[in-house]
């Protein structure tokens, strides 16, 4: 029995007594009179079904939309594309050492596959996924709840792993872990290389799933092509990086230089682990970040960002009237860095729009307004509870909601075809007393949300279709004395990031709101000439026959922060294909994971010679 199997068996047996059989499920609702919005055009599906996202070959024009080629990024594009074999200086491609390394590693893989096993076991389902070691580790870390701010257990798991393998390691007070492995035989003189990924995940779930993701393990499922979770985020971002690093540390057959595997905490909530990580003892000056989500893409730069928290205070008073409950859901959401240029709907802003329309149909006050769960994710659903205190017409309100639902169904028929708007009167015409914000404060809150910038602010003039600056409202939540809005500012230009922070400050001042800026991190700037990046691109081309796309991205990575801590640190970021990260629709491509892992092993072998 391997270390991880023993560790997890002990953990499961010790946690049996901690299970709570009386997990709280959703409260039963009293039947309520519902405005039949579903009978309106809000539920009308587009005449032409929108096809699912497809994986696009790296050499197509769509790939350029994700980023920009290396030549365009540094302004060195030539009129005639150089042959692939000319990537390596000096010897022709057929004599290049990289080609020898690729062939040698692949030959070892084939030899291992041809060795007859003493006893053949037929594996199915999750157990049959390849690479077996990578997905074995992925299953085990997925069984350990590890949402942001709840990573102590997985940090302990990594620490125990290092101890059992007699690897030197460091675990700091935040929970960051660095595990060092010696070079393989014959590679002791090679320069060390660092691998890096984060151990926290975004915890999002469908409303129908009662799971407590802080305490309960997610349920993995697969169709053989994709790995998903049952109505929750998968944690492929960045669990696949953790699994690959553990598999590499545990594999004595690979050829590699000395490895330093850096596991950071709380990346998803402002790169907090990377902020606090002491890298003074790091020997590596080359780092492979494993937090990218497109196979065949080598990321060389990313935007910087900051979390902005705006608070609007308000006084609650006792109000007598009839309550209307409104809900908007069915949106696609997504990572606010990667999907902000897709034009997807923001549930918080849609709800603010509807409340603004309803102001002309009667006087009401806000009891509650809540939407979104993560500052770095586009909100998929939002809900509000309001109380009408003056004269109003139910029929006019019904018509307003239905018309609004019809309007947004048309607006977002391509990006969010499943938007649903519902509104109901829970008290069925009876008035009652409730504590709500005053009319003036309610109007101020709605207008602040309406005035708040959102989406792509400016596109890059250098990199086609890549946002340069953006702002995404992620969370709106009601407190006892006001509402709180969490947003994410991103920009590849630090001065423009500051401009957006100043712009938000001006809006907040006009609405008498306070502002707090947290989790600021710098942009990871492009290194124009990188031998390490060139080697990574060359190895990929030799291995696959496809030239990789070297790009910049609008999402945030830890590379910028880490590179600032280690002078001369040259970083790249790679990863397998993942889709819909930060949403319950998140999925990880299994064949892509296998290819990426093979590429990583060959690249490490090449680094042993470089």
For every predicted segment, state its role.
Residues 126, 134, 461, 468-484, ...:
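Zn-dependent metallopeptidase/amidohydrolase metal-coordination segment
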Residues 346-369, 526-569:
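Active-site-adjacent substrate-binding region
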Residues 139-143, 374, 385, 420-435, ...:
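A short beta-alpha structural unit
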Residues 123-226:
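Acidic/His- and Gly-rich active-site-bordering loop/insert found
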Residues 317-321, 340-370, 391-470, 509:
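Acidic-enriched catalytic cores of C-N bond-cleaving enzymes acting on peptides and small amides
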Residues 187-285, 307, 311-313, 320-323, ...:
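Active-site metal-coordination/substrate-binding segment of hydrolases
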Residues 280, 344-361, 393-394, 441-450, ...:
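His/Asp/Glu-rich mid-to-C-terminal helical/loop segments that flank catalytic regions of hydrolases
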Residues 277-303, 403-409:
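A glycine-rich helix N-cap at a beta->alpha junction
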């Amino acid at each position: 029995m391997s270390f991880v199997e023993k560790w997890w068996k002990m953990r499961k047996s010790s946690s049996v007594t901690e299970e709570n059989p009386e997990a709280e499920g959703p409260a039963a609702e009293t039947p309520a009179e519902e405005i039949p919005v579903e009978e309106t055009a809000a539920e009308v599906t587009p005449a032409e079904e929108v096809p699912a996202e497809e994986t696009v070959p790296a050499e197509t024009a769509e790939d350029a939309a994700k980023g920009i080629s290396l030549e365009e990024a540094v302004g060195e594009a030539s009129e005639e594309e150089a042959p692939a074999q000319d990537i390596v200086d000096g010897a022709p491609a057929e004599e290049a050492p990289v080609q020898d390394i690729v062939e040698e590693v692949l030959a070892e893989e084939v030899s291992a596959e041809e060795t007859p096993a003493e006893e053949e076991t037929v594996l199915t389902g999750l157990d049959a996924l390849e690479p077996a070691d990578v997905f074995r580790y992925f299953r085990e870390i997925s069984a350990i709840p590890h949402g942001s701010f709840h990573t102590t257990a997985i940090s302990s798991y990594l620490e125990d792993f290092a101890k059992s393998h007699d690897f030197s390691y460091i675990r700091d007070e935040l929970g960051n872990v660095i595990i060092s492995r010696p070079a393989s035989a014959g590679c002791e003189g090679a320069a060390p290389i660092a691998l890096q990924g984060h151990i926290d995940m975004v915890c999002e779930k469908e409303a129908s799933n009662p799971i407590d993701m802080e305490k309960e393990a997610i349920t993995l499922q697969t169709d053989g092509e994709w790995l998903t979770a049952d109505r929750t985020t998968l944690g492929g971002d960045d669990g696949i990086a953790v699994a690959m690093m553990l598999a590499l540390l545990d594999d004595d057959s690979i050829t590699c230089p000395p490895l330093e595997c850096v596991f950071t905490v709380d990346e998803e909530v402002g790169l907090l682990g990377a902020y606090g990580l002491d890298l003074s003892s790091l020997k590596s000056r080359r780092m492979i970040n494993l937090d990218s989500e497109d196979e065949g893409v080598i990321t060389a730069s990313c935007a910087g960002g900051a979390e902005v928290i705006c608070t609007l205070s308000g006084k609650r008073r006792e109000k007598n009237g009839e309550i209307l409950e409104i809900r908007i859901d069915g949106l696609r959401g997504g990572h606010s860095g990667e999907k902000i240029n897709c034009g997807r709907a923001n549930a918080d802003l849609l709800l603010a729009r509807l409340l603004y329309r309803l102001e002309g149909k009667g006087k009401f006050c806000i009891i509650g307004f809540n939407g979104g769960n993560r500052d770095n994710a586009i909100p998929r659903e939002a809900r509000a509870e309001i109380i009408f205190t003056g004269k109003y017409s139910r029929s006019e309100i019904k018509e307003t909601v239905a018309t609004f639902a019809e309007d947004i169904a048309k607006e977002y028929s391509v990006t969010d075809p499943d938007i649903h708007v519902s509104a109901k009167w829970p008290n069925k015409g009876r008035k009652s007393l409730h504590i709500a914000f005053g009319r003036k404060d309610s109007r101020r809150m709605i207008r602040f949300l309406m005035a708040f910038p959102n989406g792509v602010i400016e596109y890059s003039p250098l990199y086609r279709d890549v946002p340069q600056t953006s702002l995404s409202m992620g969370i709106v939540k009601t407190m006892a004395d006001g509402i709180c809005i969490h947003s994410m500012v991103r920009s590849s230009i630090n001065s423009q990031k500051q401009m957006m922070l100043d712009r938000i400050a001006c809006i907040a001042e006009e609405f008498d709101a306070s502002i707090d800026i947290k989790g600021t991190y710098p942009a990871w700037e492009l290194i124009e000439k990188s031998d390490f990046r060139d080697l990574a691109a060359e190895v990929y081309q030799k291995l696959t026959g496809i030239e990789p796309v070297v790009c910049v991205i609008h999402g945030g990575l830890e590379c910028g922060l880490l590179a600032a801590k280690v002078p001369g640190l040259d970083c790249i970021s790679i990863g397998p294909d993942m889709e819909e990260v930060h949403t319950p629709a998140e999925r990880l491509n299994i064949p892509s994971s296998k290819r990426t892992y093979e590429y990583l092993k060959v690249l490490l072998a090449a680094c042993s010679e470089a």
